[in-house]
Swiss-Prot record:
It comes from Pediococcus pentosaceus (strain ATCC 25745 / CCUG 21536 / LMG 10740 / 183-1w). It holds the Pfam family MscL. GO terms for molecular function: mechanosensitive monoatomic ion channel activity. Homopentamer. SUPFAM superfamilies: Gated mechanosensitive channel. The keyword Nucleotidyltransferase does not apply. This is Large-conductance mechanosensitive channel.
Length: 140
């Protein structure tokens, strides 16, 4: 059982996931500070110096901090955008699957063309076909 666990943990996917979670945790604090200390004040500057985190609604003793929710949405959008950019950059350097499939499809098409040419040559040249049949008979 210990050996199986070691194999499971040693697989690339598990290690990649662990690294992703650790880096994601560290990245979250960077994005939060970016949003809280740069983006929100910048947005507040354009809409009259309003800080979203101060927006609250109090109803019958309950406090709804929808400004904090707006900050969370901004955090999410920034993280999603940065991940999108990172994926685009990584995909730029990886070979495209479509190109590989196109190359394989082209090779198959070329093979079919050659086979059709051979077939047509045999059909149009009965002498060649009979020579091939004679060679087959002599090897038996």
């Amino acid at each position: 059982m210990l050996k199986e666990f070691k194999e499971f943990v040693s697989r690339g996917n598990v290690l990649d996931l662990a690294v992703g979670v650790i880096i994601g945790g560290a990245f979250t604090s960077i994005v939060k500070s970016l949003v809280n200390y740069l983006i929100n004040p910048l947005i507040g500057l354009f809409i009259g110096g309003i800080d979203f985190s101060d927006w609250v609604l109090k109803v019958a003793g309950a406090t709804f901090k929808f400004g904090s929710f707006i900050n969370a949405v901004i955090n999410f959008l920034i993280i999603a955008f940065v991940v999108f950019i990172l994926v685009k950059l990584v995909n730029k350097f990886l070979p495209k699957k479509e190109e590989q499939e196109d190359d394989e499809a082209e090779a198959i098409e070329n093979s079919e063309i050659y086979l059709k040419e051979i077939r047509d040559a045999l059909v149009n040249n009965p002498e060649l076909l009979s020579n091939l049949k004679n060679k087959e008979d002599s090897t038996k």
